[in-house]
């Protein structure tokens, strides 16, 4: 089953490649104009197990599983402050990025999910929302800071590293 899903995901990547590249290029251009060059955008593809679970839950085939990928927007508040000379909190930057997206693209009604102020159990923090791209496809966007990603991935190791580094300075 998972080998078939891997092959289907690869085919889907090829099929959506041009539209996604155009969307990412446009988003990069918009965010660089509004915030600066330190914001990174990439595409994250869901794992076969995650897609299989959706297929089972929704009783559908691969073609009918929505959002096989999402657009990840990562930012570093310190780099943004150095670039712009203006301090903004992580929440302020995430909300500013959200505002930029929904002012340029039509937001899917009811798609906004705030994990930034109410993190998941694993301390995952981000803003999730969906917009209609200019190529006619709804794209799911996840906005988070580099620190939020590290905390969700490495947990207490990040916090203890920061405490250790603060003792050294």
What would you call each of these model-derived segments?
Residues 1-169:
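Nucleic-acid processing machinery
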